[in-house]
């Protein structure tokens, strides 16, 4: 108070005022501070000071022809004196007002196109709903978030090339537009921005906003998708939050969300197949998300999630060096350790072989709902500081940290046997066994851990074995903090390797990720995910397997037909028939297979009994290992819609219905495609079955005599030509092959050439 009074007295004296307002600043340090460098040191002050002047703006001399010297009120708009040090004119802020009211108008058609991201933001805010403001402590943690809704995911180099091509098409310099998205965007933007009068630099800047993901490391409590981040300043303060529902979604958030769902589904499915890595790659390459190839999205999208990172590692892309355990991302912040195998005994006297980390280390742990700092030594937890949204989330983090510490009291807290298995029915590794065990029930773990008295530290409280907060006592080494732990900010990516069981390791051999770490959470994707791989047919249930299997046969009928007649075993072993087996009652699989294979063999042996529809219908049943039995079936059962449904061996049924008139097949009422050729008994089969060893040369040639019947063909000598009658009275010219090779390709070309010859 004294100081303020003193200052007031000083200010009341005119001399003080004069010194402060009139005296020049001549202290070198101060002058240096405010004049060195191009960076403005006090922009707000500079702006106020400039705008108080009469002519704070400079403009090109041409402005004198475009704007009158005075406005309607007689106020001067520009001064005849030149700006010191340049040949520009000094202009009043009033000139801007005059220009806005009376200046030339231009077409506004391009504005919404160029400033698309702004217009869309306004729409989202207009349709968004703001709820009540609540006052409460905010646990914010810094996360890397996307601050730019509505962007494509091009790299800055790719975007640069697109921008140059769109905005400065005539500039020199090599531009390589390779990716599909680059080409599509360039074409679209060139059309949109034809005759655009907006300054090219502005267009380039706005295009960059549309094409490139911009991320910042910001303190966030709550939603992290870009439509929430754009209103961060409205939804959360230091001690308050405001509920908000965005008024629209943007594609980039949808891509991120759908990518995570697709990756999780693919990793889960690959983990149970015979060769997980090969299956995973096959699925990533054949999946599309919102019409874009998943592998293209993986290359461009920086989303860090366990399943997504496993897919990236499989493709040979770099990923973050942090590792995952129990759904938390661990990042070592200091210390180091060496690994050693050690055998330990659980409370149930079961022996576990664990890889012990020897040495002092500190980690940050970041999960979706809780974060922590962990300090540990060899098999000992020294300190754990946790913060989380609620009791449950905090407990999850404590369990993971206790298991990770590998302490003896944790291993001794195991009751019962550890025999958890993964989706492929393989035993989990010991650390994940322990984790699963305590995630199911951690009572004994918390009870046996031990408690200790605590000091009163600001912002920290203790936590008891029943997970209630306490100010006097706490679980040994564990404290709960009001402050969150920031996510690891670095965007550094490292080279990793992946084994066939999808375990991802860094170059020192540390396991960063494994399928056990992939979340089981199911969600509904925002964008359509199209899994073309047969391995993913099961994801939508038995009906989808049935429809997809038949669709696949029809789509690939040309090749299937040839394999059916020449190399059936190879056909039966195709992975596309695997999912179908789960629909056939276990007891009947072998019998059905034996029956169908015998039936097919008869068709091959007896000319003219080839029946396309029947082969398509029964083919999936022949894929199971056959049992030799004399059993005959008039119908085969498949388990769909919760019960057994019958497929008739001869004739239509609700499951498999072929319409001769439209040549279309419906499976369970869903369209499964059209048969491209006439499935009349005898024709197609005879062509491919009989013309083996013959080359079709083209249409009938009268010089080679009358048309022979198919049976007379066998009398031809090698290299001899003849006309032959096939199918429904069509005649083609053939030559008997000189050597008995490439019989398979014969049938393929035969079918194609017969068509060409007939047409």
Curated annotation (Swiss-Prot):
Oxidoreductase is among the record's keywords: no
Nuclear localization signal, short sequence motif: residues: 736-739
GO BP annotations listed: 7-methylguanosine mRNA capping; cap snatching; DNA-templated transcription; symbiont-mediated suppression of host gene expression; symbiont-mediated suppression of host mRNA transcription via inhibition of RNA polymerase II activity; viral RNA genome replication
GO molecular function, one term: RNA binding
Gene Ontology CC terms, in alphabetical order: host cell nucleus; virion component
Subcellular location, record wording: Virion; Host nucleus
Site positions per UniProt: Avian adaptation: 627
Matching Gene3D superfamilies: Polymerase Basic Protein 2, C-terminal domain (3.30.30.90)
Record keywords, A-Z: Cap snatching, Eukaryotic host gene expression shutoff by virus, Eukaryotic host transcription shutoff by virus, Host gene expression shutoff by virus, Host nucleus, Host-virus interaction, Inhibition of host RNA polymerase II by virus, mRNA capping, mRNA processing, Viral transcription, Virion
Subunit structure: Influenza RNA polymerase is composed of three subunits: PB1, PB2 and PA. Interacts (via N-terminus) with PB1 (via C-terminus). Interacts with nucleoprotein NP (via N-terminus).
HAMAP family with a match to the protein in the record: INV_PB2
Sequence similarity: Belongs to the influenza viruses PB2 family.
Role this protein plays: Plays an essential role in transcription initiation and cap-stealing mechanism, in which cellular capped pre-mRNAs are used to generate primers for viral transcription. Recognizes and binds the 7-methylguanosine-containing cap of the target pre-RNA which is subsequently cleaved after 10-13 nucleotides by the viral protein PA. Plays a role in the initiation of the viral genome replication and modulates the activity of the ribonucleoprotein (RNP) complex.
Protein name: Polymerase basic protein 2
Species the sequence originates in: Influenza A virus (strain A/Chicken/Brescia/1902 H7N7)
């Amino acid at each position: 108070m004294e100081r303020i009074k003193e200052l007031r007295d000083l200010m009341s004296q005119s001399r003080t005022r004069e010194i402060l307002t009139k005296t020049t600043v001549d202290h070198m340090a101060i002058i240096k501070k405010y004049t060195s460098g191009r960076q403005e040191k006090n922009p707000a002050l500079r702006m106020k000071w400039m705008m108080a002047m009469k002519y704070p703006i400079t403009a090109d001399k041409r402005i004198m022809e475009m704007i009158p010297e005075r406005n309607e009120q007689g106020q001067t708009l520009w001064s005849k004196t030149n700006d010191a040090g340049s040949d520009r004119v000094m202009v009043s802020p009033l000139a801007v007002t005059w220009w806005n009211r009376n200046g030339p108008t231009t077409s506004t058609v391009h504005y919404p196109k160029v400033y698309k991201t702004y217009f869309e933001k306004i729409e989202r805010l207009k349709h968004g709903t703001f709820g009540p403001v609540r006052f409460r402590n905010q646990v914010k943690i810094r996360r890397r978030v996307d601050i730019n809704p509505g962007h494509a995911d091009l790299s800055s180099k790719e975007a640069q090339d697109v921008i140059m091509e769109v905005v400065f098409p005539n500039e020199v310099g090599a531009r390589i537009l390779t990716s599909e998205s680059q080409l599509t965007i360039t074409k679209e933007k060139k059309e949109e921005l034809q005759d655009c009068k907006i300054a090219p630099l502005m267009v380039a800047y706005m295009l960059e906003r549309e094409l490139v993901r911009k991320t910042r490391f910001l303190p966030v409590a709550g939603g992290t998708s870009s439509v929430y981040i754009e209103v961060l300043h409205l939804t959360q303060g230091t001690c308050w939050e405001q509920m908000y529902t965005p008024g629209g979604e943007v594609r980039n958030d949808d891509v991120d969300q759908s990518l995570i769902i697709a990756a999780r589904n693919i990793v889960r499915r690959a983990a149970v197949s015979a060769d997980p890595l090969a299956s995973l790659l096959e699925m990533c390459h054949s999946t599309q998300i919102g019409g874009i190839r998943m592998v293209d999205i993986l290359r461009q999208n920086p989303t860090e999630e366990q399943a997504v990172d496993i897919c990236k590692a499989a493709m040979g892309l770099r990923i973050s060096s942090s590792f995952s355990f129990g759904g938390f991302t661990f990042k070592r912040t200091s210390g180091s350790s060496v690994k050693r195998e050690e055998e330990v005994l659980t409370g149930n006297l079961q022996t576990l072989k664990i890889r012990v980390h020897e040495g002092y280390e500190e980690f940050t742990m970041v999960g979706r709902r809780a974060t922590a700092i962990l300090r540990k030594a060899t098999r000992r937890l020294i300190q754990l500081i946790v913060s989380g949204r609620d009791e449950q989330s905090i407990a999850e983090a404590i369990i993971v940290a206790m298991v990770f510490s590998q302490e003896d009291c944790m291993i001794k807290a195991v009751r019962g046997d550890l025999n958890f298995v993964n989706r492929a029915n393989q035993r989990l590794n010991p650390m994940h066994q322990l984790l699963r065990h305590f995630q199911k029930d951690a009572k004994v773990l918390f009870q046996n851990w031990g408690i200790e008295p605590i000091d009163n530290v600001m912002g920290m409280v203790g936590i008891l074995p029943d997970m209630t907060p306490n100010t006097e006592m706490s679980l040994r080494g564990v404290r709960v903090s009001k402050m969150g732990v920031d996510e690891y900010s670095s965007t550094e990516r490292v080279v990793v390797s992946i084994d066939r069981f999808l375990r991802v390791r860094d170059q020192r051999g540390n396991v960063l990720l494994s399928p056990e770490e992939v979340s089981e959470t199911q969600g509904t994707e925002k964008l359509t995910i199209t899994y073309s791989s047969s391995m993913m047919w099961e994801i939508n249930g038995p009906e989808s397997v049935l429809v997809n299997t038949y669709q696949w046969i029809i789509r690939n009928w040309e090749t299937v037909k040839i394999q059916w007649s020449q190399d059936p075993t190879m056909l039966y072993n195709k992975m596309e028939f695997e999912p179908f087996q789960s629909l056939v009652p276990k007891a009947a699989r072998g019998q059905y297979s034996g029956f169908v294979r015998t039936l097919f063999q008869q068709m091959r042996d007896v000319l003219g009994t080839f029946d396309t529809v029947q082969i398509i219908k029964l083919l999936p049943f022949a894929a199971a290992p056959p049992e030799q039995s004399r059993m005959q079936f008039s119908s085969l059962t498949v388990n769909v819609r919760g019960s057994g449904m019958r497929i008739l061996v001869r004739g239509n049924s609700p499951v498999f219905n072929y319409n001769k008139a439209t040549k279309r097949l419906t499976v369970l009422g869903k369209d499964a495609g059209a048969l491209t050729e006439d499935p009349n008994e005898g024709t197609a089969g005879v062509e491919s079955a009989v013309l083996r060893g013959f080359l079709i040369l083209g249409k009938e040639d009268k010089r080679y005599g009358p048309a022979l019947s198919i049976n007379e063909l066998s009398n031809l000598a090698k290299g001899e030509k003849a006309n032959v009658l096939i199918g429904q009275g069509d005649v083609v010219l053939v030559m008997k092959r000189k050597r008995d090779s490439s019989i398979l390709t014969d049938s393929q070309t035969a079918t194609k050439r017969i068509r060409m010859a007939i047409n």
